Amino acid sequence: MKCSLRLFEKAGRLSVRSQTVQTFQQRIVLANGASYLVNTTLPKPYILSIKDITNMPLNNPKVNALSSIRGQESRRSKFEERYEGL
């Protein structure tokens, strides 16, 4: 917990205002099971990351989700062949 004092002037007199920021350690768990700690102001102890670099199909080409992208490439090539001369 960090605590700092800040002086500010209000109606011609100085006052002391305390500004308190509480930080918590948070564990972020990636899709592949790896985790790391981050200091944050969110009081949640952990976050399960749904989308990260370990489960995105473009970053991890071994994932089966790329089959739909390959299917779109073949559809696009058929479309380009059909309307090539226009």
Curated annotation (Swiss-Prot):
Induction, as annotated: Differentially expressed during meiosis.
Chain segment of the transit peptide: 1-18
GO BP terms: mitochondrial translation
Subcellular locations according to the entry: Mitochondrion
GO MF annotation list: structural constituent of ribosome
Gene3D superfamilies from the UniProt entry: 6.20.130.10
GO cellular component: mitochondrial large ribosomal subunit
Keywords assigned by UniProt, alphabetized: Mitochondrion, Ribonucleoprotein, Ribosomal protein, Transit peptide
Assembly description: Component of the mitochondrial large ribosomal subunit (mt-LSU). Mature yeast 74S mitochondrial ribosomes consist of a small (37S) and a large (54S) subunit. The 37S small subunit contains a 15S ribosomal RNA (15S mt-rRNA) and at least 32 different proteins. The 54S large subunit contains a 21S rRNA (21S mt-rRNA) and at least 45 different proteins.
Function: Component of the mitochondrial ribosome (mitoribosome), a dedicated translation machinery responsible for the synthesis of mitochondrial genome-encoded proteins, including at least some of the essential transmembrane subunits of the mitochondrial respiratory chain. The mitoribosomes are attached to the mitochondrial inner membrane and translation products are cotranslationally integrated into the membrane.
Cross-referenced PANTHER family: 54S RIBOSOMAL PROTEIN L36, MITOCHONDRIAL, LARGE RIBOSOMAL SUBUNIT PROTEIN BL31M
Record family assignment: Belongs to the bacterial ribosomal protein bL31 family. Highly divergent.
UniProt name for this protein: Large ribosomal subunit protein bL31m
UniProt source species: Schizosaccharomyces pombe (strain 972 / ATCC 24843) (Fission yeast)
